[in-house]
Amino acid sequence: MNSSTLRRLLPVAILLAGLAIFLLLGLERYFSFEMLARHKATLTAWVAAHRLLAGLTFVLAYAIMVAFSLPVAVVATPVGGFLFGTWIGACLSVAAATLGSIAVFLAARYAFRDLFRARASAMLARLEEGFRHNDFSYLLFLRLIPIFPFWLINIVPALLGMQLKRYALATLLGIVPASIVYAGVGAGLGAVLKRGEQPDLGIIFEWHILLPLLGLAVLALLPILFARLRRQPSA
């Protein structure tokens, strides 16, 4: 492996090393609702006294969680809602998750796109052609429906040649609905923790939440459907 290849793999290696260190040291225990319940008075007092700094710190910490694909990012948006309220917490979470996703996207594109193209050029060419025509709608759909792993959706568009600004905008718009839901859950977290209970993060799969998300996802796919209909030869 030459120095050029090593240099290209370095960003991804750093992200993977960070994830490995996090898991090996068992640091996930510090990012739990139990830990939040233990320190909520200190946290809320600090946020109230340093609102701007607290917001920036939250965004930075959350973005790092997403960039390193840490398995604790799911608690970050509810914590944002708890500390900052539903709407500010959702806005900060969207900004942070978008920034972290961009970091993964850039690392994957820098490290793997040429290698992926060399190993699977014919397949990639077909996928890339279809994805390029409808990349924004495809990615928006994937972001709206919380089915696929977040880290996987961060990587695939990079390998398929999606433009960064289109990726960033589709990511930002696509994660807004779920972020509002989870931040809303977090806004009521104080009472839940006081009762010694855990918040229900599965709420997003309840029908009164999931159906509107499915509706938005269908709307995101409409441009793809219309494009295919236009390409079909008329009888």
Regions inferred by a protein language model and the residue ranges of each:
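Hydrophobic residues within alpha-helical transmembrane segments
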Residues: 60, 64, 91, 95-99, ...
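Membrane-interfacial helix-loop-helix
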Residues: 2, 6, 15, 21-59, ...
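Membrane-embedded alpha-helical hairpins and interfacial helices in multi-pass inner-membrane proteins
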Residues: 166-172, 188-189
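Transmembrane helix boundary and interhelical junction motifs in multipass membrane proteins
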Residues: 62-91, 147-154, 165, 178-181
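Small-residue-rich transmembrane alpha-helices that serve as helix-helix interface/gating elements
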Residues: 206-219
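Transmembrane alpha-helical core residues of multi-pass small-molecule transporters
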Residues: 81, 96-100, 145, 158, ...
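Juxtamembrane "helix exit" motif at the C-terminal ends of alpha-helical transmembrane segments
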Residues: 23-29, 68-69, 76, 81, ...
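Hydrophobic alpha-helical membrane-interfacial segments at the cytosolic entry of transmembrane helices
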Residues: 10-19, 170, 214-217
